[in-house]
Amino acid sequence: APFSLATA
């Protein structure tokens, strides 16, 4: 899955 600007 592509990375988003939000951290998990």
From Swiss-Prot:
Indicate which residues the UniProt annotation says bind urate. Answer: 7
Entry's Gene Ontology BP terms:
purine nucleobase metabolic process; urate catabolic process
Determine the domain of life of the protein's source.
Eukaryota
Catalysis: reaction(s): urate + O2 + H2O = 5-hydroxyisourate + H2O2
Keywords in alphabetical order, please.
Answer: Oxidoreductase, Purine metabolism
Activity regulation information from UniProt: Inhibited by two structural analogs of urate, oxonate and xanthine.
Q: What does this protein do?
A: Catalyzes the oxidation of uric acid to 5-hydroxyisourate, which spontaneously decomposes to form allantoin.
Q: How does it assemble?
A: Heterotetramer.
Q: Which family does it belong to?
A: Belongs to the uricase family.
This chain belongs to which protein, by name?
A: Uricase
